[in-house]
């Protein structure tokens, strides 16, 4: 089963990075390939959200239920989308009050080979660039 794991050391606090990753409504403003996002349910400890991605004329929507551990972790579980399985999450590890390590880990499997052929490479590129996109977003938002 394909896996993606990316991390970055950033000069921003765990609170700042957690807030950015949890701000699903802002994703289309800065995430490559993200054309829309919606929060379907939200509480202090969980969120269900849908994200629309499009690249090279291929568009897909996937929905995840996210378990929120404030300023530490966001666990993701597939609700709906072109996957048989999608699990993973974000970890925020404090290095100092002004710096942290951000890590994204995803395990996924598409519903069938046709979808994997059409969308697999695109999804891997998009998911692989997410940590960098959030790092650049943090510089825009917090270094102003």
Regions found by a protein language model. Give the residues of each.
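Hydrophobic ligand-binding cavity/cleft-lining segments
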Residues: 1-44, 144
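Residue-level preference for beta-strand/loop junctions
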Residues: 2, 43-45, 58-60, 84, ...
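Hydrophobic/aromatic beta-strand elements that line small-molecule binding cavities or substrate pockets
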Residues: 6-8, 38, 62-67, 87-94, ...
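A short, structured loop/turn motif at beta-sheet edges
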Residues: 14, 40-45, 67-71, 91-101
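Hydrophobic pocket/interface hotspot
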Residues: 17-21, 27, 49, 66, ...
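Glycine-rich portal/gate segments that line the openings of hydrophobic small-molecule binding cavities
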Residues: 38-79, 133, 137
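Beta-strand/loop substructures that line and gate deep hydrophobic ligand-binding cavities in soluble
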Residues: 78-128
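Short, highly charged C-terminal tails/helix-capping segments
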Residues: 136-144
């Amino acid at each position: 089963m394909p896996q993606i794991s990316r991390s970055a050391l950033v000069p921003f606090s765990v609170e700042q990075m957690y807030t950015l990753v949890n701000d699903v409504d802002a994703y289309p403003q800065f995430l490559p390939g993200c054309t829309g996002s919606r929060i379907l349910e939200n509480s202090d400890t969980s969120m269900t959200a849908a994200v629309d991605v499009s690249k090279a004329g291929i568009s897909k929507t996937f929905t995840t239920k996210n378990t929120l551990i404030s300023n530490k972790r966001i666990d993701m579980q597939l609700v709906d989308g072109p996957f048989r399985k999608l699990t993973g999450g974000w970890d925020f590890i404090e290095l100092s009050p002004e710096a942290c390590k951000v890590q994204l880990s995803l395990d996924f499997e598409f519903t069938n080979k046709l979808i994997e052929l059409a969308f697999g490479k695109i999804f891997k590129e998009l998911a692989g660039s997410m940590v960098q996109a959030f790092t650049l977003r943090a510089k825009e938002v917090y270094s102003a």
